[in-house]
Amino acid sequence: MEAMKVERILITLALLLSPALAFAEDFCGDLKNAFGPFDYRKGHTEFAANLHLVEIAHFTPEVEKGIKGSSSYLGGDLDYTLRAFPNHHRALVTMAQVGLRDKTPQVSQAKYPVECYFNRAIRFTPDDGIVHGAYANYLFALGQTDRALDEFKQAVALEPENPTINYNLGLALLKVKDYDNALIYAKKAYALGFPLPGLKNKLVEAGKWDDKPQ
């Protein structure tokens, strides 16, 4: 019963957060914030001092690991971090992991559902391929493979030399039995130095791996 309830909520969120729907911003809130918002990609340059202030109080190692909150509840600290830095890559990953771990679309004490934080990040920095990749990983973990593929493809278009994104897109393509394209992205990921053999092994098992150069 609980699993069915969560699934219904996720389907509703998927409809609400479709990029084609104008009210996604109303549902997930606008990006104005008392502190920020700042671009996480500039967190070691232009916004280094701002990032330090946020992380030392709200994104401690225990928060990042999803163990417990620092200044408040875990969900509250993640929310604060992601309102100040909407595209904070590591905080987005933690928010998604906690939601998956707790089997809930909205982490306790977070202001918005997990998907909203990705929606906000994409609205803030639509050209951030790491955000699209993290969102794709979340959708893939939920079993929403088609939506995950769309996000992975956007991520690869923005970050074509990122080995992890290429690898994960290959895994998603393998899931839908698109072996030819899975092989292309697998080979690219390995050429870029991705260390794990899992995707290659799965393609070998399916009889789809070859050692021809791309």
Locate the predicted segments by residue.
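Canonical tetratricopeptide repeat
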Residues: 94-97, 134, 168, 202
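TPR alpha-solenoid repeat register
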Residues: 91, 131, 165, 198-199
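N-terminal leader/linker segments that initiate helical-solenoid repeat arrays
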Residues: 24-76, 84
